[in-house]
Amino acid sequence: MQQYLTEARKLSALAVPVIIAQVSQTSMGVVDTIMAGAYSATDMAAVAVGTSIWLPAILFGHGLLLALTPVVAQLNGSGRRDRISHQVRQSFFLAAIISVLTMLVLYQGEYAINLMSNDSPELAAKAIGYLHALLWGVPGYLFYQVLRCQCEGLSKTYPGMMIGFIGLLINIPINYIFIHGKFGMPELGGVGCGVATASVYWIMMLLMMLYTQRASWLRDIRLHRPAFRPDFTVLKRLFGLGLPIALALLFEVTLFAVVALLVLPLGVVNVAGHQIALNFSSLMFVLPLSVGVATTIRVGHRLGEGSVDNARIAAHTGIMAGVALACCTAIFTTLLREPIALLYNQDPLVVAMASQLMLLAAVYQISDAVQVIGTGVLRGYKDTRSIFYITFVAYWVLGLPSGYLLALTDVIVPRMGPAGFWCGFIIGLTAAAVMMVTRIRFLQRQPAARILARAAR
């Protein structure tokens, strides 16, 4: 028991800064939406449309780079800190390649926007402008993530917290300047949000780079600086570890995007209720997500130390902590669902719909916590391919089809509307949680030599 309590304290020390960093990053999008909405409804809608293209593309790139965290954690735990600098440099090469490809995809996003907004040329023009401004922040964002993954892999989560919070604070005045055209800048409206956010990503990257160049605890890593040229063996390994993570993120993001489109014909009340419930549950999701990041670090570090038993304790502690948090957030959501919905909208019909869906959200929070922390555990074991297969089956083979049948057909029960899709979320996330735990148990029963060999790849 003492081992679990000690591990829980270490996990908490890592997870709390990650929570603050994640909230800061999420809040930047909220700030963009609110400030664009204060300028005009069209600009707010343009930011929302542009973000719907931006988010899947940038999260895919982000997912590819997440492989660096367990790699650094394992090297740090095994005492091979002299090799970390080389892995980070290769991640910069990977980030540069991803940046170019992501920018090209986002630039072509205007075709999707024109299809989505064919009845409103003004909205389409503003959304395209926002996206084209924001795409220049892609390299800054991805380079920042490389440095953040390096710090987190070394069990230092405070730099990401502090710089993420600074980024949120400076995003507000820069937004104001470019939206309203202050201090000699052009008045860009919603497009100004894209300019501001892209600028903030570069500022965050420069601050993180300055920090990593000055931090005393990184001095020994800075001393080992191999030639700055691509190592295709390392690049291939990082890409191979990161691709399943990126695809899993893409599956999740596109699942919610597809459901939003399927709910759209069901009317304003259903759409508004769905969005309120989804927005709030996404905020609650930050807690287990952050525990999952911390669990990746702890499992990777323990495996680097050569301790399979301690890695198992770290994994179990992370999952138990996530379940405990999920129970608290589920109770909170259940008891306060109506007051929370009223914060978003005063329409009684919208509040009633949102409250109903938030009750379903409370049901799946435990499954959601187990699956996202399970993902973190598997990343720590460098078993990322299973993450890809599990998320694909859970979300697209089980979750979405069952949700569609329940929501829009009479095949199983009379049409449930949006609640049917949320029942599909419950089915998909529960299936993912069960498969994650099953896979983790399978890995942990393997011979120690095999587990450590996989971790050392």
Curated annotation (Swiss-Prot):
Cellular component GO terms held in the UniProt record: plasma membrane
Record's bilayer topology term: Multi-pass membrane protein
Alphabetized GO MF terms: antiporter activity; xenobiotic transmembrane transporter activity
Residue ranges crossing the lipid bilayer per the database entry: 11-31, 53-73, 93-113, 127-147, 159-179, 190-210, 249-269, 276-296, 313-333, 357-377, 387-407, 417-437
Subcellular location: Cell inner membrane
Keyword match Transport: yes
Keyword Lipid metabolism: no
GO biological process: sodium ion transport; xenobiotic transmembrane transport
Main location: membrane
Keywords: Antiport, Cell inner membrane, Cell membrane, Ion transport, Membrane, Sodium, Sodium transport, Transmembrane, Transmembrane helix, Transport
Alphabetical list of HAMAP family matching this protein: MdtK
Role: Multidrug efflux pump that functions probably as a Na(+)/drug antiporter.
The family this protein is said to belong to: Belongs to the multi antimicrobial extrusion (MATE) (TC 2.A.66.1) family. MdtK subfamily.
Annotated protein name in UniProt: Multidrug resistance protein MdtK
